[in-house]
């Protein structure tokens, strides 16, 4: 599905442009979905919660390209779109799965609990 992989970079760009506060972004993409759907142990950095985190560099500038897209569709409506603010590392269940724009381990996800 186009747009999933580009959601965070595009929204971080809005934060850098003053259109969105980082606290609001965290609520929108982390906390609110888990609260809305009643997903347990996700969405917050808290003791006994799953260690699912994304580390971002708010100063990193990137031009989004179709060849960066990992989804099966292989394209993005944001092709050639320049963003400032980019994820540099993703941690799933405490394991680093993406670092410096390279997948280093496939996610070892677990079923969600509601």
Indicate residue ranges for each PLM-predicted region.
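C-terminal cap of metal-dependent C-N hydrolases
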Residues: 50-102, 106-111
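His/Asp/Glu-enriched, well-ordered alpha-helical/loop segment
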Residues: 1-59
């Amino acid at each position: 599905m186009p747009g999933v992989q580009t959601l965070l970079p595009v929204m971080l760009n809005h934060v850098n442009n003053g259109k969105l506060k980082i606290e609001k972004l965290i609520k929108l993409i982390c906390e609110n979905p888990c609260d809305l759907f009643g997903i347990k142990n996700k969405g917050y950095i808290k003791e006994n919660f799953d260690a699912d985190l994304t580390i971002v560099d708010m100063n990193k500038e990137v031009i989004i390209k179709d060849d960066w897209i990992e989804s099966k569709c292989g394209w993005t409506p944001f092709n050639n779109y320049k963003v400032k603010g980019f994820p540099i590392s993703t941690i799933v269940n405490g394991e680093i799965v993406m670092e410096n724009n390279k997948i280093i381990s496939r996610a070892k996800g677990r079923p969600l609990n509601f």
